Amino acid sequence: SPALDDEHNDNFLRF
């Protein structure tokens, strides 16, 4: 999942 991907964790933290 991109939301949990280290290289794309900005999506997960964008909340």
From Swiss-Prot:
GO terms for cellular component: extracellular region. Disulfide bonds: none annotated. Keywords: Amidation, Neuropeptide, Secreted. Its main location: secreted. It is found in: Secreted. The keyword Aminoacyl-tRNA synthetase does not apply. The modification Phenylalanine amide is found at F15. GO terms for biological process: neuropeptide signaling pathway. FMRFamides and FMRFamide-like peptides are neuropeptides. Belongs to the FARP (FMRF amide related peptide) family. This is Extended FMRFamide-12. It comes from Austrophasma gansbaaiense (Gladiator).
